[in-house]
Amino acid sequence: MPSDQPVATGVSSEEIVSKLKNLGVDHVICIPDSYQKTLIARLTDDPDISFMIACTEDEAIGINAGLYIGGKNPVLVIQNNGIFASINTIKAIPLDAKIPTLMFVGQFQRDPMLPIEESKSRAVRMVEPTLETWGVPYYRIETPEDIGNIELGYKLAYDTLGPVAIIIGAPTI
C-alpha cells in the first residue's frame, strides 16, 4: 500500500560522480537508462571520466573487462532489464573470470512510493532475487543517505574480484 512519503528519493548525480572520481573511476560504460539520465548527462560532460555507450549489456561487460585488464578503472551504468539480458555474460566474465564489475542498475518502472517488493513491475521485483541466485552482492541507493554504498560496493567488487550491483531506486537528480 502506498504511503504518503516516497520510499525512494532521487540522489544527486553530482554526488555520485564525485564519489566515482574519489574512487579513481576513469571510464563509464553505459546502456542508456532513463532512471539515471541526469547521471548520464553529467558523466557525458565530465572531462575526467571517459564515457562510452555500448549496444548491449553483454558488450558493456566485455568492454569493462578489457579496460580492467588494460589497467583502467571502469564501472557500468545499466537498467534492471539489463541484468536479465546479460546473466550469462555476468556468469562468464565477472564471476568465472574474476573481473571486478561495479554495475549501477536503474530500477526502470519503479514507483518510488512503493517498496521494491510491492512493485507492480516484475522486472523491479526480480532484480534482487536474480542477483541473489547468482551470488552477486548488491547495495541499494534509495535515498541520499545511501550514497556511501557506492564506496562499499566498489571495494567489495575489487576485494572479491567479481560483480557488485548498486541498485538505483529512484531517478537521479
Label for each model-derived stretch:
Residues 1-173:
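Thiamine diphosphate
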